[in-house]
Amino acid sequence: VLNIIQQLFEGYYSVFDAKALGSSSNSFALEAFKSNPLVAIQHDGDLSRIEDNTRLNSLVSHELMTVNEKFKSTYSNRFKCFLFMGTNKPVKITDAKSGLIRRLIDVSPSGNKLNPREYKAIMKQIEFELGAIAYHCQEIYLNNPGLYDDYIPIAMLGASNDFYNFIIDSYHVFKREN
């Protein structure tokens, strides 16, 4: 899917390092966004151990940020970029009020698989279907633009937030004592 998104946004995407965005020590983490891409993609990222979510929160909130590129003067920029990250590990959400929860959409595979021959045949046709794919995505969005306004990534919270799990496990005890 990420390869298809790259093809749809050819010339308007960049690749990024999610781990660098969540690290307080990497001063060049925003360098990947210097071309101000519409879409940023990381095929195999890791946000399971976010040291400092300040930079990531500011990026997904489209706030004015200071960019430090190697061998250049620092400058300020506001990035309006949609981030896609593939990962096998849950995102560690450290601050429920940070806004990351409101902006994160956790997508899991459906489990519907094609046999290898069908997969190869379909993948060969993707390039010729990009216009139809883009149109379909636009139509789905326009039919219900607010679909994810109240979305909360419950599965991701359950996989990475110990306090959330404690409350879920103890809810009936608290309710009984109340």
What are these regions (language model features)?
Residues 1-178:
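Feature primarily recognizes SF3-like P-loop helicase cores of small DNA viruses
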